[in-house]
Amino acid sequence: MCIRDRENIMEEFVSNFIEEFRNLFINDKDIKSIIAIGDGIANLKKVGPELNITDKITRDQFRVLYHKVVETTPEVLSEKYGVPYERATLMLPMAIIYQSFLDNSRAEDIITPDVTFCDGIVADYMDKNGTLLLNKNFDEDIIASANSIAKKYKVNRKHTQNVTQNALDIFDSFKSVHGLGRRERLQLQIAAMLHSCGKFVNMNEGTMMSYHIIMSTEILGLSHKEREEIANIVKFNEYYLPSQTKAQVSLMTADYMKVAKLASILRLADVLDKSHRQKISDMKFSFKDYVLTMTVDTLNDITLEAGVFKTKTELFRKVFGVKPVLKQKRGL
């Protein structure tokens, strides 16, 4: 089999997977750069010394590298560019994979930082043990990842945005009582964003479908435990939350009290937009004698929301020992 035949077969095989990846995760996103690390990309850079590549490979530069690898045998690549033979045999499939990523993402270049996967493992270990402090805040990346999932499952954007904002406002209104921090607030935000994504799969079993979607979908920047907690927050937004002893088996590694607290907040935020017409926003809060009063200044008829609200406060009262009250102020 000639080199060109091998290239065509590999390209056809690889493109199938890359196209599936594009359809699932990229869609219409504007991808400007691909980041590549490891020996594979480092060896490919050796093939074009005349290109003076440092930490970025343009599309045109990569096309030159690609043709050189396609037209050269592993034996020659190894001898001419000082690449170990076993690594040289991998250069053609690596070149095809990167070229396919460029074609399918329409990225402008490939960024090649001088780091390896092992560097990442060491940095992660040092960060967790307090010997290295990473200042990068990944919240925006996590939210962007959740937004992609919400878009994929065609959630009602206006409804989820309203529920999300109300949930965060409730969370912020009595911090001194719930004792939860920034990370838990982020989990509540993601749960609110994805609480109805399962309706795209099954309208009648939307909540359980949402649970399964979150459990089976990686969210960049979240641990498996955090994602499991978010899935259960969404589940118990609608379903009855049993006692800790009975619930622990189904919760697996999730923290029961965290799930209970955040699910109780999400329940209130969700019913505040029961009609899906965004009648309630910009609430004013007052907390006194363990009563959390939510005052809404609106001329809208919130009879539906107010009625259902009263049926959704039990878990909140049990978990926090706080009575939530919804009041309407009909201002002009």
What is each model feature region?
Residues 4-267, 273, 288-290, 294, ...:
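Helical "lid/coupling" subdomains associated with nucleotide-phosphate turnover
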Residues 272-324:
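Low-complexity, glycine/alanine/valine/leucine- and proline-rich hydrophobic stretches
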Residues 108, 320-332:
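A short amphipathic beta-strand at an alpha->beta junction
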